[in-house]
UniProtKB/Swiss-Prot annotation:
Coiled coil: none annotated. It catalyses: shikimate + ATP = 3-phosphoshikimate + ADP + H(+). Substrate binds at D36, R60, G82, R139. This is Shikimate kinase. One of its GO terms (molecular function) is ATP binding. Pathway: Metabolic intermediate biosynthesis; chorismate biosynthesis; chorismate from D-erythrose 4-phosphate and phosphoenolpyruvate: step 5/7. It comes from Shewanella woodyi (strain ATCC 51908 / MS32). It is found in: Cytoplasm. PANTHER family: SHIKIMATE KINASE (PTHR21087), SHIKIMATE KINASE 1, CHLOROPLASTIC (PTHR21087:SF16).
């Protein structure tokens, strides 16, 4: 790989963006970044706290700035937050500054992967499945719209998915 290109992972919560991203970055000798972790680092607080204090709108403003900053780097793998796709500015930055990989997963798999995770503010409700279904209806078309590559993550290990991404990208 002569030039260091960016790889941006998009997809719903529970798709495996962070886990797969770490494997991918290690395999390709690239830096790994997670936009949610970067927000936590910059604010000194976790995502749930940011949602509680600033609301989703405040969180999305922070997320837009973080993604703008990170996508200006070269030679990175970036795991984006599941909702970041809703921002036109973020979609434009991802499309213009790297290769976008959509990690696709089923609602059943999302529920299984996120059911014990208390760090997901949008799922702290009585029926998280309904929330995930509603989010999928809104967000999945946006993931598909900007994706250069789509990879299904159900029933596969993170390492296998990372290898599939590398093969599809021809790296």
């Amino acid at each position: 790989m002569a030039e260091k290109r960016n790889i941006f992972l998009v997809g719903p919560m529970g798709a495996g963006k962070s886990t797969i991203g770490r494997h991918l970055a290690q395999m390709l000798h690239l830096e790994f970044h997670d936009s949610d972790q970067e927000i936590e680092s910059r604010t000194g607080a976790d995502i749930a706290w940011v949602f509680d204090v600033e609301g989703e709108e405040g969180f999305r403003i922070r997320e837009t700035q973080v993604v703008a900053d990170l996508t200006e780097k070269q030679g990175i793998v970036l795991a984006t937050g599941g909702g970041s796709i809703q921002s036109k500015e973020i979609r434009n930055n991802l499309s213009a500054r790297g290769i976008v990989v959509y990690l696709e997963t089923t609602i059943d798999k999302q529920v299984a992967r996120t059911q014990r995770d208390k760090r997901r503010p949008l799922l702290q409700v009585e029926d998280p499945r309904e929330v995930l279904e509603n989010l999928a209806a809104t967000r999945n078309p946006l993931y598909e719209e900007i994706a250069d590559v789509i990879v299904k993550t159900d029933e596969q290990s993170a390492k296998v998915v990372a290898n599939q991404i590398i093969e599809q990208l021809g790296f």
